[in-house]
């Protein structure tokens, strides 16, 4: 039998569809009956490299190269389906400009900040890194060192980085790019429930009667979940979908109630819904009385800008504990939200009254099971934590939580923003399993697990992502290592903060990346990095599902994984180089040892021999280090959460499964947390138990609407919102190197309302400048297509390295989560 490429693609699609439908697969669609070339493929499972959905894909390898991928029919997440990015996964590793040797800026054979990138060996790279790190340590101590990591790190990479920075170099100046996307979600969970990550799971997609999207374009950003939601909507006539956004996008195609609101007024809409529930007598009084407390939050907390910024000076609560709150009762809460009437909120938000009432009734009706989804529209918000708290309020007031179909659900954007950034604790203030560096008991637990002297881990939280850029610019952060992200393209206010910091002569910047990204080109040293299935690893997705994969192919010669780089670099430092004598005196047996010895080889990380790796499996990192390092890192990390409601299964089990949702207790995963009968950590007889709080009660917060940091005025008369598109992922450093995806969406355009274009004498395709108080960027006008902004707002995606929209954005952050607001700033547009 012969089969051409087109038939093969069609056959895969048939197989996936048949699997979902539960019907038999035609012979032409079976992987077992193919052409002779295709039967040479070796297939294995892996978690997708892109978004936080956590699809499983089958990866086809031939002649040492990934040549095909398709949706994994055994996956409970995607059930054989794949989005367009996942379909082209096989091409992301084979861009023509893949890096294979370290590159150092040099002039006449010596390092020079203004020199040209010159190939050097790995030994030379580590030598200059060690020299620069030691110089910074001797001059200004551990606070002069920093690292910016990623929600794309594997679990093991993130854990290795946390140990190296917080235990080895004794600095908390490590933060992930998840600070830009998930920090507000973390803050919301911790404030309301005292514990992080969603209580629901993707099974809610088949159980809910209604879905509400808050600042989430699932149709493009989470297309596989959108497929499941669409199937539920179209197969069950009673199911309804509401979509709220500041502009119309593809998710509105399915909306029964689509609402365009004025930026920042989602806060007022959320309070109106709470008021409606109370005024119509639909509060679940039994649930509320048994399982919740009420608190009034601090207000007017500023915008996370530099302290000297006029907006920070103006904030009445500037300088106080911005996340503090005081107890109130239900009546006081009801009075607080009573001012958010349908009339006033409609006027403020621009949403018609009947649409607001329809939305509120959906939540209020006790017969309707509601799942709320949100992503960056909520989180990238100067009041992002508040927005998260306020949507929880609605679910708590009605008791619509932690049962099938009733979930407030924060969706993640990166493959392991949950599994690595949040669960491992790669944030500047966190440790694994929701522990924090400020808590002495938590530090003691970490020091015990890591077998460190008491006092090794510093108590002061480190510099968060935005503050890292400011400290680089100010010359206070001098040795800086960036891994697995493209922050020079992703960070807000590039012109004024990010770029000046990278090019500050006082600083030495290292960037680890497979490709010469914008960030890499701003660095002093570039390290070539292995990608995805060129290494063994694990990711954790948005529904608490941890997944693993084996190494399937060799990286290009010279490219090394992020984990290998971190652990190998640790060999360059003896304990005496980085720890004070009084600390070493508490554990004299470490004297003379390297950080590699203390943190990895001689720790519990190093106790799993190479013989535990299956003989037929590649594992370059472990064979370099002499022990099964991925298993060792995972098992040590997992010890933080076992018995503390973050339980993970034994490492080897994950290789046999399509992931497991934690907590995994007695071998069984957990679908819905905080509900007795589903969550093993709930106390018997509790019904619901929000055990993250000492009294088992979740908190309903009274928090007001407050305006955005920057709004349009006479000169800068337009709102700018940024985001993504279906075809590209984040900065496009992978997807723009896939020819098919690049051709489908080659350039980032600015989407405008036709009336705004006409007013400025602009037409579709015109070259224009977007200008803010901080910078400008050129692009072309689009007045048609998938994104339809209202009058007064424009939308521009940020995937295009040739059109850096973050030159114009404002680096305002949520003062609680320190997450950047990329959705709201003021600009003007002029023709070029």
Curated annotation (Swiss-Prot):
Its EC number is 1.9.6.1. Residues 1-29 form the signal peptide. Predicted to be exported by the Tat system. The position of the signal peptide cleavage has not been experimentally proven. Substrate binds at residue 798. One of its GO terms (cellular component) is nitrate reductase complex. Component of the periplasmic nitrate reductase NapAB complex composed of NapA and NapB. Belongs to the prokaryotic molybdopterin-containing oxidoreductase family. NasA/NapA/NarB subfamily. This is Periplasmic nitrate reductase.
